[in-house]
């Protein structure tokens, strides 16, 4: 009999393509089901997600379906935490497949390390076996696309970090610092983990544990996601009272550089050459990554697809970040519905 009761919370919305395999990976855990509860908090899905989950709730007593009429992730997390009973609270995502030792390993290290939050390495996989989907998955996990987050590029040893995907928390963390910020449709985990470390909490990345996360399956969905990430980042910084890092400005500066540089290049040959050089460098880096990926996956079109996908990520995030700054300066509301 395990000592710790684990409450697993999964915010979901229109996940009919992926939710069954997520649930099956949870049912395959080597942690006793008597010591687990799995709470699927649904944002009132309009596809078959609720029917699929309901089929499982009818068969397994430790699986429950909870309504989230507010739709967004932070509301789902908070409702799940309030309804949960475990002394360990674990968040998962319906787009992921988890190794069978996921729950047991995170629970063990949470207590062995004396940590407040622990998490696994995030391996991004293609939604479908197409060139576009592979390009999205590669760009969404490459440092050139998304920066050098430890949980995305991986580490060799257990290490402290500023955030982990999803997370496994001690329940007392929420009693100490509160719940997730419902203003943050995106980036609520970044804000929460920063709040946790500001209160002296510790977060560890467990590198031997890898989860497979399914990337967005279209360029449009990918752009919407990165726009929202960029949009809410300035609000996170404002709430935490933290200055923005230089790296956060790069996509916005890239966007402004394309717009302003394109205009100014009409009046100066020097600016035109500088403008062309920056665009060429960005394209060259994307093509170089594309060449390596094309050889590995035997998909030659990745050579031209990767620069396109990288550019869309950077421009979408940059546009979102610029819009986020505008909303803060103009005191506008951040009304965005999170969806796939």
Regions of interest found by a model, annotated:
Residues 101-134, 138, 209-210, 214:
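Conserved donor NDP-sugar-binding/catalytic core segment of glycosyltransferases
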Residues 254-329:
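Membrane-embedded multi-pass helical conduit in multi-pass membrane proteins
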């Amino acid at each position: 009999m395990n000592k710790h009761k684990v409450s697993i919370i999964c915010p979901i919305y229109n996940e009919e393509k992926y939710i069954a395999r997520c649930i099956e990976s949870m049912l395959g855990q080597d942690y006793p089901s008597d010591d687990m509860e799995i709470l699927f908090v649904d944002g009132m899905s309009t596809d078959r997600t609720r029917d699929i989950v309901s089929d499982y709730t009818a068969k397994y007593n430790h699986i429950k379906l909870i309504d989230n009429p507010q739709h967004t992730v932070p509301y789902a997390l908070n409702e799940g935490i309030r309804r949960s009973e475990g002394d360990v609270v674990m968040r998962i995502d319906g787009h992921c497949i988890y190794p069978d030792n996921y729950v047991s390993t995170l629970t063990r290290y949470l207590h062995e390390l004396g940590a407040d939050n622990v998490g696994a390495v995030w391996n991004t996989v293609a939604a479908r076996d197409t060139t576009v989907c592979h390009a999205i998955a590669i760009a969404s996990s490459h440092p050139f696309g998304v920066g050098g987050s430890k949980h995305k590029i991986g580490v060799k040893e257990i290490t402290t970090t500023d955030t982990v995907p999803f997370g496994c928390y001690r329940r007392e963390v929420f009693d100490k610092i509160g719940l997730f910020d419902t203003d943050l449709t995106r980036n609520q985990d970044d804000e929460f983990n920063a709040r946790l470390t500001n209160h002296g909490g510790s977060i560890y990345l467990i590198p031997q544990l890898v989860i497979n996360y399914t990337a967005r399956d279209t360029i449009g969905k990918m752009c919407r996601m990165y726009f929202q990430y960029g949009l809410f980042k300035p609000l996170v910084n404002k709430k935490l009272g933290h200055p923005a890092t230089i790296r956060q400005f790069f996509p916005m500066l890239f966007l402004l550089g394309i717009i302003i540089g394109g205009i100014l290049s009409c009046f100066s040959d020097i600016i035109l050459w500088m403008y062309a050089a920056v665009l060429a460098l960005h394209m060259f880096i994307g093509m170089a990554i594309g060449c390596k990926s094309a050889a590995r996956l035997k998909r030659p079109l990745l050579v031209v697809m990767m620069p396109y996908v990288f550019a869309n990520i950077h421009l979408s995030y940059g546009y979102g970040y610029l819009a986020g700054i505008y909303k803060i300066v103009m005191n506008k509301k951040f009304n965005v519905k999170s969806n796939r």
